[in-house]
Design a protein with these regions (language model features):
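Hinge/lid segment of periplasmic solute-binding proteins
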Residues: 1-53, 60, 99-103, 216-222, ...
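A local structural motif
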Residues: 66-73, 145-148, 161-176, 189, ...
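Short helix-initiation/N-cap motifs at beta->coil->alpha
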Residues: 77-81, 173-187
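C-terminal capping/gating helix-and-loop segments adjacent to ligand/active sites or protein-protein/ligand interfaces
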Residues: 235, 278, 283-284, 298-358
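Extracytoplasmic/periplasmic substrate-recognition and gating elements
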Residues: 208-277
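Extracytoplasmic/periplasmic solute-binding protein
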Residues: 35-45, 50, 80-144, 190
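Glycine-centered hinge/linker elements that transmit conformational signals in sensory
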Residues: 83-87, 136-175, 222
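Alpha-to-beta junction loops
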Residues: 1, 104, 187-196
Length: 365
């Protein structure tokens, strides 16, 4: 197993090029590899994803109402449309509840900035501007670079402002710790909820008392206003298969044959999907071996449709806890009307350079 780009560089002399393997041919999203020195050094064996969880039943019901911004969920494929829909839903809560028999209070579940929730925004939403800037700069998408410009922080602001304005939560109380976005969504009070596929289990666990069911759940990308038409969900992993290039060719061939067996045989696919509960990014996982997780199903469909998964660029964050804490502090003040957006930019950009320097000084020691 190779966990990331740094590990691939460390073991570069020992990783066999997998670009001609059956494993690579079956991979549904070719971004789920680690490249090193013009070779495919490692290939993901499973992944997690996050994006905008949404209540499919309520959203489809809204689309059928008179005056709805869109007539189909499929029309929500960019930030501008998403914002118009969220704005409209949030302004018509009473009408929607009356017509659909729902108990909505908001379009978006609360964007809590307390320690138990702020990682969704200082980590997962912050991933979006990092990803697009790293992509522009041509650097490794998960290893990052020592300085950033904040090229896409206006997009970050647009999405964040939507989260806050189209929620019932008081912007001054987002760091109070009294909010529970999962519960709001689970009880059918919100249409949208930024989080990941790990939420499928708690949302569908009957012991939690939520009203949503598996049939209500789906996920769409965090449309960011940059490359919306090509964007998939945010997909990442630290679990990649690699093959030892120093082994004999006979052993290499046997290993490649075994890995292909794992992703094509009934026994191998059953072990991954049903026994281990993992989501595998291969076109062989269909039928009985397709993931039961509705959010992972959405990720797989977007991959199959040719959308590009957004890498987990937040993995490059230097001194992650300190950097995020400064971003959250500035974001909290801005949202409460007690600070300026420029302070968020400073925490994001200058904070990155400062923490990178500190982190690499520590590495040098």
């Amino acid at each position: 197993n190779v966990g990331n780009s740094s590990a691939a560089q460390t073991w570069n002399d020992y990783t066999y090029d997998l670009k001609d393997s059956e494993l690579y041919k079956h991979l549904t999203d070719k971004s789920l590899v680690i490249n090193s020195d013009d070779k495919v050094a490692a290939i993901a064996n499973c992944y997690e994803c996050y994006g905008l969880i949404y209540n499919k039943t309520i959203l489809e019901g809204y689309c059928g109402m008179d005056g709805a911004v869109v007539s189909s969920v499929d029309e929500i494929n960019n930030f501008d449309t998403l914002k118009k829909v969220a704005d409209d839903i949030n302004s018509r809560i009473d009408d929607i509840n009356k017509e659909l028999g729902t108990d909505l209070t908001e379009a978006f579940a609360s964007a809590g900035l307390d320690d138990g929730s702020s990682w969704r925004f200082a980590g997962h939403l912050a991933n979006m501007p990092l990803y697009y800037e790293f992509k522009d700069d041509g650097c490794d998408l998960t290893a990052g670079e020592e300085s950033i410009k904040g090229t896409y922080l206006d997009n970050f602001k647009n999405v964040w402002d939507m989260y806050v304005s189209d929620s019932a939560a008081d912007p001054k109380t987002l760091n109070s710790g009294a909010l529970n976005a999962e519960s709001e969504f689970g009880m059918g009070e919100a249409v949208f909820y930024q989080n990941g596929d790990w939420e499928f289990s708690p949302l569908t666990n009957e012991e939690n008392g939520y009203v949503v069911t598996a049939d209500d759940l789906s996920m769409m990308p965090i449309y960011f206003g940059v490359d919306d038409e090509n964007e998939g969900l945010c997909v990442g992993t630290e679990n990649y298969w690699a093959v030892n290039a120093k082994a004999s060719q006979e052993d290499i061939d046997a290993t490649l044959e075994f890995l292909n067996w794992v992703i094509t045989s009934d026994e191998g696919r059953d072990a991954i999907t049903n026994q281990m509960g993992l989501t595998a990014p291969y076109d062989t996982f269909t039928g009985d071996y397709e993931t039961k997780n509705a959010f992972a199903q959405a990720a797989n469909k977007l991959m199959t449709d040719g959308k590009t998964s957004v890498a987990w660029s937040f993995n490059a964050t230097p001194n992650v806890d300190d950097w995020r804490a400064d971003v959250v502090s500035a974001l909290t003040a801005y949202t409460a009307g007690e600070g300026e957006w420029d302070a968020v930019k400073t925490a994001f950009v200058d904070g990155w350079a400062n923490q990178w320097k500190i982190a690499h000084e520590d590495d040098a020691q």
